[in-house]
Amino acid sequence: MKRLPAVAGSFYESDPKKLKMQIEWSFRHNIGPRDIPKQTYEKKKRDNLFFVVPHAGYIYSGPVAAHSYYYLVSEGRPDVVIILGPNHTGLGSYVSAWPKGEWETPLGSVKIDEEILMQLVKESEVIDLDEKSHLYEHSIEVQLPFLQHFFDDDFKIVPIVIMMQTPEIAEFLADAIYNVMQKNPDKDIVVLASSDMNHYDPHEITVKKDVEAIEKIQQLDYKGLYEVVEGKDVTLCGYGPIMVNLILAKKFGKKAYILKHATSGDTSGPKDSVVGYLAARFGS
């Protein structure tokens, strides 16, 4: 079973050569890390297990996303990347994983880690196996070319989209991921929370709203983040995935480090209506 790209040619370049150039542009951008990460091939214990990455078009959020990938790549190739994204389309189940096969992008195909996936399904009791949720969803797809650029096809993924973004669902998923990571100590597993921040307010208002959410992220306060999103009109689309990583970070004794916050007005255009982007890592 192969999942074909839905947003190649719109969110990112569809030509492989141009796509690689676009990814390197993201790293060298003045909003980005301004450098290409050097990949280590020495196998050692990974410090940064969990990340927040944005998922807009690369011309808007690529330079911010590059900050998270800089740290991920610098610590070497993971065996498995669990990618949690919000469900923008409203299709499919409340929490759904692509069941098997591979995902294709212009840079090639990446296989699903079916063994880890089925362990998660068994542990969580809330994950459905459902392709419909993923067919047109961009939040996971846009992460793959960044990973493929450095690791080719030498890693596997577990793609999960979350429509019901509640603290209770986040707790179920975090417990399941924690248990699976504990049961597979020889597998190098990282978890990406794919999310943009506040949407379509002027730059100054977006920054103010985002700062309130970022404070909760720094405190690993997942319930506080939920309250900010729900109570203060912060239109943060992937708060469910972020809540999962906040819970996991606390379970693993990690701290939150904000790598970069910017808006689409900073990266590529007008500031009268912008989207906020955040890169964060959770490590020692």
UniProtKB/Swiss-Prot annotation:
User: One Pfam match, by short name?
Assistant: Memo
Identify the InterPro entries for this entry.
MEMO1_fam (IPR002737)
Determine the domain of life of the protein's source: Archaea
Q: For this UniProt entry, which segments traverse the membrane?
A: none
In terms of Gene3D superfamilies, this protein maps to: LigB-like
Family membership: Belongs to the MEMO1 family.
- The molecule here is called MEMO1 family protein YG5714_2180
Lineage at the top is: Archaea, Thermoproteota, Thermoprotei, Sulfolobales, Sulfolobaceae
